[in-house]
Amino acid sequence: MAPSSNKVGKAIQAKKAVVKGSKTNVRKNVRTSVHFRRPKTLVTARAPRYARKSAPARDKLDSFAVIKAPHTTESSMKKIEDHNTLVFIVDEKANKHHIKRAVHALYNVKAVKVNTLITPLQQKKAYVRLASDYDALDVANKIGFI
């Protein structure tokens, strides 16, 4: 390319810059902290093309799965007679709320207190203290403890 045409091209670019105008006073953002916090950007809700699971997971700990069996030893019978307390072997994953709800659902009795322990055989045992308006002996007979 000839030197004269190059000068013409530069002149045209300079003319365009003058007509357009240029920002001369760009204000710098003064940062007062040494830490940079990433700005919050727009987070859109997910709209998947298809569901990742074909069916929702079922509840594995229903009332029948929580309570495995009644515990029928002499000490358990003494608890029934003396302390109005039923003793059950329950699922290891069940907590006290699950046990209380399961006893109410299966046997229609109100539990006041639930104590749990894990036996050396790695079974969970639940001591369910019944409300004073229920008799543990009657409930045990109805269930089939005795």
From Swiss-Prot:
This is Large ribosomal subunit protein uL23B. The keyword Acyltransferase does not apply. The gene is rpl-23A.2. Residues 1-22 are annotated as: Disordered. Keywords: Ribonucleoprotein, Ribosomal protein, RNA-binding, rRNA-binding. One of its GO terms (biological process) is translation. The keyword Cytoplasm does not apply. Belongs to the universal ribosomal protein uL23 family. This protein binds to a specific region on the 26S rRNA. It holds the Pfam family Ribosomal_L23eN. PROSITE patterns: RIBOSOMAL_L23 (PS00050). One of its GO terms (cellular component) is cytosolic large ribosomal subunit. NCBIfam families: PRK14548.1 (NF011118), uL23_arch (TIGR03636). GO terms for molecular function: rRNA binding; structural constituent of ribosome.
